Each structure stands twice: as C-alpha cells, then as structure tokens.
Amino acid sequence: YLILWEGGFIMDQRYQKLMDCYACFQKKISFVPQVALVLGSGLGDYANDIKVVAELDYKEIEGFPTSTVQGHEGKYIFGYVGTVPVVCMKGRVHYYEGYDISDVVLPIRLMKLMGAKVLFLTNASGGINTEFRAGDLMLIQDQISDFVPSPLIGANMEELGTRFPDMSEIYDKKLQQIIKKTAAVNDIPLEQGVYIQLTGPNFESPAEVRMCRILGADAVGMSTACEAVAANHMRMHICGISCIANMACGITPNPLTHKEVQEAADRVAPRFKKLVTKSIINIAKEIPLDE
C-alpha cells in the first residue's frame, strides 16, 4: 500500500488514489453537497425526484470503481432535495464484484471530501426477523460487518481519521430519532433493527440465515456495513434505511432471485421516496450542516 515518492516522502496508494479522484471531481463539478445519499438495488429511481444541477458518470473519474450490477446505473447526481444540497450515488460498487475493499468505500470517502457531513445509506435486503414482511422498511440501528474485510486494514490514513475509531454509535441516534418521527408523522410504517453484511454474490444458505439470527441480525445484505465503517472513520453522521425485498432463505420456501429484489423495491418506492425526502429536509432543519 505504501509507495516512495521523490524527495523521500511516503504516500499511501489508497489515499493518493482518493485524492486523484477528488482532483478530477473538482475539475468537473463545483457543487458542494451537505448530504450524501447512496441508492441501493432497485432504488435508483429516487434520483428522478432530485432537482438535478449536474451529473458525473463514474467512468469520467479516472481510477474510479464502476458498478457491474443490474439496477446500479453508476453515476453521481448533484442537486437539491427541497433546499438541501445533496450528492446521490445512483448505484454502488460491491465487494463481490472483485474490487479491493478500499475501492468499494472510495466513493463514500470522496463524498466526504466533496463536503457532505451526513451519509444516508439505503439498500435492499433479506428479512431475517420473522416479524418482517417483504416490502417493509427498516431503520438500521446497528450493524455486523465482520464477514467482510474492514476498509481500515492497512496503514492508517491519518488525513481521514484515527487509527482505532469508536464504533459505539455508528448510526447517529439523533438522525434515527428524526427519521422515526418523520415516518410517524407521515403514516409510514417503519421497522428497526440490526443489519448484517455478507460477501455475496450468492444468496445466503438456510444455515447461514440461522447463524445471522443467532448473532442478532434482523436483515442481511451484500453492502452498506463496510461503507458505514469508512464513513464513521471520517466522522460523518450516518443513518440508513433497508428495504426488505424478500424474506431470507429458509424463512420462505421460495428460491431467491435478483429480479425479486428489484420488484419489491418497485412496490415500496412511493413510501421509500417520501420517507427519504422528508427525512433529509428534517435532518437539515435540526442538524447544523452548513458550519
């Protein structure tokens, strides 16, 4: 990870790559977001509700990882939700696509450098909690990320954060309260629970789902947790909503497909869009984002 530069300076390749991507962004876009939003599988249509001022395809950023998954278009959207300046990832990259974990979280780190203070994560997941049903929305209260490598492994990038970051409140409790209140006021049913990230791309076996339940997980997916680790390292305020696209293997007798995930996301889209939009507006009212 370390390379020697002229004059004897040592620079982390991962940090240099991040800064190269940031320099490329600065040449193309002058927009400064306050909130960063990541749209999960099948949820990309939310970007149509943003008052767009600019777009940047991932392929236009030299060295930037690009998504290969159906339902993940692969571009940054810059614009406004209400009057709140946001940057939206329309499509994310996943560890199972073969990228190094540092590349998987590079888009998150870049949004922090752009100016975003809040990270709003979304995903489509499998329900483990038997009280859940396909189409439910779950507020992520905590996570289990030990089944994928930590993006903090390797020499610490001191410019981004401390070597041993605290993880006692990854998902900001104040943001959780704002989202729960927003859901209640707008009559949007909202579950809450723990999200666990496994590597994918294969869906989980029934035995693995039983293991996840024993560990305390309510929903399982193939993204998000590693992104939250990287964002927490950079001291971002993090919140997350998981769309329960299907019940996990062993809970339902039916085989799981990616098409099912996308169809469930389509069904929940109106509630999802309303909750995300109103939550972002309320977050901006209650959290000082322009300081």
Task: Write out the residue ranges for each language-model feature.
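His/Asp/Glu-rich mid-to-C-terminal helical/loop segments that flank catalytic regions of hydrolases
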Residues: 249-291
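Non-catalytic positions within long, well-ordered alpha-helices that form the structural scaffold/packing
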Residues: 111-115, 213, 232
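Zn-dependent metallopeptidase/amidohydrolase metal-coordination segment
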Residues: 222-260
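Generic non-transmembrane alpha-helical segments
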Residues: 24, 28, 174, 178-188, ...
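Short, Lys/Arg-enriched N-terminal segments with co-localized hydrophobic residues
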Residues: 1-10
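Active-site/ligand-binding-proximal alpha/beta "capping" segment
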Residues: 176, 182-218, 283-284
